């Protein structure tokens, strides 16, 4: 039995709930439409990267991605790692199994149709492999992905680590990769930095010995790869397509862009060698948004690998000593070549007395310099074991103690 007129509150509540339900489904539907290019397949694949502004087409390169700084794990934590390696059937990876057995490998044997990991076409050198891995594993990435070549020793590996790729893997500081997002594992600037590719360079100024790829780097190519993006005055980044990237940084780049890059590789009429070289000088742009990306060499060695000389000037002093030593070795090598040629001809080398003195002096000087350089490197490694020393040579935007480095009384 009703004791009075119906209460107004329940009706208002029901109306509110119905309105909320309608709003919810309308919101989900409209959001889904704006993200139609983001194909579901996992919980992550349905989300937009935080670097992409709401309502922006992932392939609109005129609007830069907003990359965010990463955070290293707490001290003592482990990082998951995978090494992506392109190779041919003739290349041997036994050195990786021997020297870095702890590192999981994802191998792409590009000329083997029965290989476990496949690329759509053997084209574009390592770029096709790198892009295919990212596309295929976008939702299942380790903390750090290290993209590397198959050979252990190469001129483009780090000089202070014996040009040894195994040391790159074993000494790599994953905290640095997590913090920066992207790290070229080569520290030396040349070739590629600080001022390398110019898309408006006059034809008569091309350097076909040091930069054979520059003639292919024209405005039209940039616009094909990054439609809508401003033409940069220079593209400069450390060679040679070996780098580490964090999971978060890869996922801050929309998946559609990696698919777009690979499609360009598949369809371009450019020679295979140079289409791969095109990407060699834009990996840093893809993962940082910077056309020019040339981290300080001493910082790369110190924070990246624990080889700390105590600042840029001391690092530069070491490099100069090393260059001087190498110049003397080149001088001595000319004498050695003459001796080898004479031996092949069954003769005694016809060195003058003055030349013999020069050779002895060079051998002695080189020996002394080698011992000095060895000690400097050993001291640098010991310094790198000290977290405070490493912090002294690590990039930072923190200015809280910056005036501690100014000459006394110069603070303004």
Regions found by a protein language model. Give the residues of each.
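ER/Golgi luminal nucleotide-sugar-dependent glycosyltransferases, focusing on the catalytic module
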Residues: 2-412
